[in-house]
Amino acid sequence: MTTATTNPSTYPNAMAVARYVGISASKARRVIDLVRGKSVEEALDILRWAPQQASEPVAKVIASAAANAQNNEGLDPSTLVVATIHADEGPTAKRIRPRAQGRAFRIRKRTSHITVIVESRPSREGRRGGAGESAGGARARRAQGSKAAAAKKAPASSSKKAATTTEASEEAKGGSQ
């Protein structure tokens, strides 16, 4: 793996590149899309349980980038986030598979280059509200508010509904005897 330090953003960062990985770039991208923007710890957790074969080399590159950030740049591993991650196509090895009647089909063994840049971003625990707030937090508050509103309306309507269902069940019992 190749390592280097780049500075495309204002946050301190570190980089790792795995070249000639024996996975096609399209299959690696399926896994990469799962972890883009996540913290390094969360990304490694996701990849540990991902069933795809590409998750192992992607996890190795992320772990390498995190180690580079810690050892070379002196960054705190708990604040690292997968800022940039992408898979480019590498060279394709061509092989032949013999087929019936003297034919031969071509097998393309594809490789890829996986690049990861991790950044040390401040934790979000200290911040509340504002533009940096996650959509999940706002969604949870909206859901909680609607549940409270539904609870205020529910006692009256649920008692009417319960009364009608018991009357209907009594009629059904009385009519069948």
UniProtKB/Swiss-Prot annotation:
- Which cellular components does GO assign to this protein? cytosolic large ribosomal subunit
User: Which Pfam family, just one, is annotated for this protein?
Assistant: Ribosomal_L22
Biased amino acid composition, Basic and acidic residues: 121-130
Ribonucleoprotein as a keyword?
yes
- PROSITE patterns to which the protein is assigned, alphabetical: RIBOSOMAL_L22
Q: Where is this region: Disordered?
A: 118-177
Q: Which InterPro entries match?
A: Ribosomal_uL22, Ribosomal_uL22_bac/chlpt-type, Ribosomal_uL22_bac/org-type, Ribosomal_uL22_CS, Ribosomal_uL22_sf
Q: Which UniProt keywords apply?
A: Ribonucleoprotein, Ribosomal protein, RNA-binding, rRNA-binding
Q: Which organism is it from?
A: Mycobacterium sp. (strain KMS)
Functional description taken from the UniProt entry: This protein binds specifically to 23S rRNA; its binding is stimulated by other ribosomal proteins, e.g. L4, L17, and L20. It is important during the early stages of 50S assembly. It makes multiple contacts with different domains of the 23S rRNA in the assembled 50S subunit and ribosome.
What protein name is recorded for this chain?
A: Large ribosomal subunit protein uL22
What PANTHER family does the record point to? CHLOROPLAST 50S RIBOSOMAL PROTEIN L22-RELATED, LARGE RIBOSOMAL SUBUNIT PROTEIN UL22M
